[in-house]
Each structure stands twice: as structure tokens, then as C-alpha cells.
């Protein structure tokens, strides 16, 4: 695997080595013989003295790293469904450059005990780390670990090792792999651009990622459990992550998922007292990859304020013959969603233009698709799909909203935001209006004429009522109904009928976007669907040895 990135020196600040007991008294993270900087290609003998091959009955299963003279750190998923009595069949080979067999000078040590976090259930859920206690100490150099407050150099180049996948030789050799360290939000953003639900938001709390070099292959099968390492200015190498999983072999746009060492540092310190943990000196400049991938549903500001003029980066303003006719929402670089009723009797594309975000630029339309079942707003299916004539460039001022999947949860009483129109100096401006979701039966009753029955609120509809004092505004057809879940904003509705600005009048009724997942997906234009973000999880631990069951 040829590597093409230029090496970048990683400078993140001064480091103090907090020494533990015996193992940490010698220098951790000191790379072996070789050039001052690692080189892409085959690993040199002794270059990474802490590199471990974790084997079962002599066969390589996973990689690992020596973090104390009797402890090896690896991935928990390497030991799934393992019976306690099988510990004797496992061993660790240190100093070998061959995946099978041993290089000259390599050392093989047995495994006495295995520790797993309590929180570990499956590698995709996080907490994918394990500690192997060796049967006797080794003299190999150990790898440094980070303190919980360690700031990772996101966007910078770090290193991993992987077993060469481009050879048919059974005994694969160890190679150096340069990886770009990627934060969890950016990693999820990259995976969500693949538009595959099974791959959406894979980076859970307690994870980070590593991206391969452009056009090159990163860690692969057999590399699980191996360390991802960053170099400090004083020469210490610190393990920032454990290779956990990836989609096929890691590529630039499908990063490898890593177990975050800083998040799990307290757990490690509680179990490996001899390891050396690094703490960074005050004043370290944080490195960020925040702008390297524009995620759907992300806001750089604090969020909307009631009555404020809209500055949302996904707002769409649909103009017919130059006059504002409807609202809408940007859901990808080329797609805007709005209400179908906006185009009844006026479907000539050249008559329309679309403004986006807060900027003055306008886009033409290349294609217009109305839902085939639409007849009138009260009958449902009031959704239109607009394909822009030219793609937009996403950035701080232009970001798409996330679309909900069919099982997206939007309970009655949920808070959200809609847009109305307010006039200032004779000019219409979109105004943010806080709302709550109203149940279908209550919504139907409020739409009833005096003494009559209400209109049916169909399953593909959602109603809202204004929170607090009704604002001075008018409704805008096709305007988005949005709500936020743990920092991610979703497009949950498009205004169809009713009044978005008046709580005492008929409630606003929206086309519920979760009901249109299949219709939107079948149009075969990529848009940004997203899973609901999960809450943060805590980590714990348990010991697996001769006295406790492997399922602990």
C-alpha cells in the first residue's frame, strides 16, 4: 500500500509523564531504531516495540499494544463468546513483524486474565477495549496512554500499524499506516454522506476515527485491537485509540472507528496502575476538524429565538416570477423539499427561482416532482421534490437539514420551530415561531366548523400549535417544521394548511416527512437521512478470570 501524504509534524504542547510504579519508571512511548519520522511501508524491526499479536492456539486474531510490563491493551470484540476455560489457549507475541509465526527476537507470553468493561455489549455500541494480563513480565518498551483531559489533535496525521492486505502470502508483514485523526461528529458526517442507513452515525460516544490517505487503504481485517498513536514534541508516542471496526477496509471517506483512550482513561488507570499516563501542560492549543465535513442538521449558533428573523442555513425561499411564493428546506447539495400545492397551475420551471440561507444568490430548477397521490392539501401527500439546476457549496451559511427515517419519534407535546412571514418596511422576512406538536384528534376538532365535524388528520400529517403569545406573522406554505435532538436538527414537516402563527385559529398542519422515507429514497437522488443521536453512555468494568463467568 503506497502512501502519498507528506508527513506533518504533530505539535500539541508540552507533556508531563505521570509515572506509575515499576513499569512506568522506564520511558514509555519511545520508538525503536529507524529514521526520525516513521515511513510509509514495511515496519522496521523494533520500530514499535509495544506492538502485539494476540493469538489463539497460535493463530493471529487481533493486534494489541503493551501498556505495562504485564498488560496488553486490545479490543473487546476479539473475545466475544469466549469461554473462561479457553484463556490457556491464548497468547501474546511481542516484537514480531509477521502475522503468522515469529520474527527473530520475538517473545511469546501466555495470558493469565482478561478484563472487559461492563458497558461492552457489541463493538458497534462502543467500549470496545480489553486488557490482557500476561503470565509473566516482559522487558519490551511500553506505549504511553492519555489522561482523561488529553486534547486530541483532530485533523493532524497520526500512525497505526496494519498487516499487509495486498499479498497472497499467508505470513503477512506489518506495515506503517498514516491516519488522519478524525473527531466523532466529523466521522459521522463522512459516513452519513454514503446515504446508507446501516452505516449512519457509527461513531458512538467514547469513539473517534482515523481516515486513510487519499486513494489508499487503511486498517483492515486482522488489525482490530491495534493502537493508533500520535507523537508528542518531546518524542513520546501516546496511544489515542484502539482500532475497532470499519466498513470493509478503511478509506478516506470510510474512516476506521477507534475506541477513544481519553474517555476510557479512568477505567484503565483503575486496572493498570503500572502504566504511564500523559497529561498535557496548560495552554495547549486545541486542533479541530470542525469544518472538514458539513453535517446535516448542524447549527453553529445557539439555535433559534422566538420572533427572530430567520438565519437558518437550510431555509429555502421559492419565488415565482420573482415574488416570494413558498418556503422549503435544503436537504442535500441539490435537493429542496416543499409543499406540492405551491405548484398547482404553475409548473413551468423557468418561472421559479430558489434563494437559500441568508445569502442573496438564487438557483434555478432542473426538475420538479410532485407526489403522485396529491390532489389537495386536506387529502395529504402535500410534498414536492425540487432538483436545483446547480449544486450548492455547503459551508457555515448553507447546511442541509437531516431527514427523519420512518421510525423517527415525534411525540405529542414535542417542541419545534416553524417559519412565518413578518413585514418590515414593506418587505417580507421569515420569522421563527416556537410550537408544540398537537395530537391528531385535538387538531381535527379545532379544524371543525361550528356544529360540524373536524377534518380527518391523516397518518402522514402532523399538527402544531403556537407556544406563548401568538406572533405578528403570516403562515408560509411549504415552510419547514424542525425539531432538535441532542444538537441535530431534523426536518419533520412541511407546512400544508392551517395557520402557523395563530394559536387561537386553526392549527397548522404539516406533511410529516417520516411518512415519506420510501418515496424520497425511491427518487434516487441522495439526501441526508439521519438516525436520532443517542445519549452519552458511561463505562464500567468487570474481570474475566477463573472465578468469574465470561459474560460478566
From Swiss-Prot:
Disulfide cysteine pairs (residue numbers): 62-78, 158-230, 187-209, 220-249, 326-342, 443-463, 473-501
Organism this protein belongs to: Mus musculus (Mouse)
Encoding gene, per UniProt annotation: Prss53
Family statement: Belongs to the peptidase S1 family.
Coarse class of the protein's main subcellular location: secreted
Location relative to the cell: Secreted
Transmembrane segments: none
Lineage of source species: Eukaryota, Metazoa, Chordata, Craniata, Vertebrata
InterPro entries: Peptidase_S1_PA, Peptidase_S1_PA_chymotrypsin, Peptidase_S1A, Trypsin_dom, TRYPSIN_HIS, TRYPSIN_SER
Matching PROSITE patterns: TRYPSIN_DOM, TRYPSIN_HIS, TRYPSIN_SER
Record keywords, A-Z: Disulfide bond, Hydrolase, Protease, Repeat, Secreted, Serine protease, Signal
Signal peptide (from-to): 1-23
Cross-referenced PANTHER family: SERINE PROTEASE 33, TRANSMEMBRANE PROTEASE SERINE
Gene3D superfamilies assigned to the protein according to its UniProt record, in alphabetical order: Trypsin-like serine proteases (2.40.10.10)
Domain Peptidase S1: 24-273, 294-525
Name of the featured protein: Serine protease 53
Listed GO MF terms: serine-type endopeptidase activity
Residue runs in coiled coils: none
